Amino acid sequence: LAGVNSINWARVLAQIVYYFSSAVSLGAPSRKVGFTVPTGNFGDIFAGYIAKEMGLPIDRLVVATNQNDILNRCLTGNGYHTTEVAASISPSMDIQISSNFERALFYAYALDANEIAKLMDQLKQNGGFDITNAALSALSYHYSSGMATEVETSNTIERILSRSAQLLCPHTAIGVKVADDFRDHAVPMITLATAHPAKFPAAVKNCLLYTSDAADELCS
């Protein structure tokens, strides 16, 4: 509990707040809203699951990943099996062991701690594990998923900057791209912005076909 990283339970609890705040601003609880969350460690989107269980009318929670898409592969029925990590312009997602996904599995396996311990042992010993159909069904009930390639991420940064003068960090751009894939005009979709673009200046500038004054100012 000392480090305020994504596995810290206090951080997950704090993240619940902005699900309620943003949903209420768009009409909740009178209307449902959706959330797309760029994530590698599953902490931010797990906070959304808790918010949903607390009664927030969330239509869907969408996991957005980069090319290191172990979460997307898992949630689309291909098991949780690690592969070699490929360096990307969204480095916070360049992982294969998602530290908070164990918490989601715990609920998907009906609070069976012994079964989760076995899965974690398989992950340690064999680099992955398969998920039962029942658990996958439970996960799919709460979570959808999608991914964005490097080119799609760069194109999204460029498109949003050109259209609205908003400069996105690569992780947020992945969320926006995946949110577009899941867009339902009857239900508003909120994409969580995970970092300021100035945190990744080289990656952001390399994504742009041109360097705007806004990009220079924000990334300097």
Give the residues covered by each predicted segment:
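Structural motif
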Residues: 1-2, 33-34, 59-62, 165-166, ...
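Active-site-adjacent helical/loop segments in soluble small-molecule enzymes
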Residues: 2-32, 107-184
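Glycine-rich phosphate/pyrophosphate-binding loop at beta-loop-alpha junctions
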Residues: 34-122, 192, 197-208
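Extended hydrophobic-aromatic, low-complexity segments
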Residues: 168-170, 186-189, 200-203
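Single conserved hydrophobic/aromatic residue that forms the stacking wall/gate
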Residues: 210-219
